[in-house]
Amino acid sequence: SSSFISHEQAWINLNRELPDSKDFDDIKSEGRKAWNNELSKIKVESEDSDYGISNKIKFYSCFYRTLLFPRQFHEYDKNGRQIHYSPYNGKILDGPLYTDNGFWDTFRAVFPFYSILYPEKLGEIMQGIMVNPYLESGWLPEWSSPGHRDCMIGSNSASIIAEAYIKGIRNFDINIAYKGILNNSENEGPLSSVGRKGVKDYNKLGYIPFDSSVNENVARTLEYAYNDYSIWKLAEELNRPQKELDVFKKRAEYYKNVFDPE
């Protein structure tokens, strides 16, 4: 057994997950049952051919891998209360924490998939992968692994939060999440893994110029514009001031600035 919290917590985890009353076959059976329960939530019909069977195998293999992440980082104490070691500030804190996810890779399809199949669970994930990291570090993550890791461009945390809330998912603190979104949209972070690189040029010019010190200029401009579109739609849902709506509505069209009309 293992724990990020303490030796005592590792024993709690072990006794909860592998009590003496269960043997190897019991655990194997429970694992098979748990996975079949999840994978049976979608039924795929295929033609009875090598091609059809191959596609069916491919679908369920991808479904299985989709459910592996984000990873649950929190643990349950002896009273069943959620607690976690924070990779953001080194403290032991209450509540959920999820990690091991890069949003540039997952905002397009994975999180929309969760919102359809696991709406209630997604709310807890939002609290654990967006809200709590912001409270513990002052920044929304873009790739948590398990803390802030530098790789992903854009601020797609905003896109994921906006989609979840607009689709009716409410069991997370949207007000804290929105504060994090606004902070990301206006600032470069103290680490290159958070905030927006080139944000001053982007907000002033409507794009990140090629001769700036920031790489991936066009890609970042496109990502930021989509992120700002998402913020605009979320701000509408939250009844934010019109002046604020106008800012993000304008920025949402900055993608046009990197297209050559010829």
Tell me the role of every PLM-derived stretch.
Residues 53, 88, 100-103, 151-152, ...:
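Short helix-capping and inter-helix turn/linker motifs at the boundaries of alpha-helical repeat units
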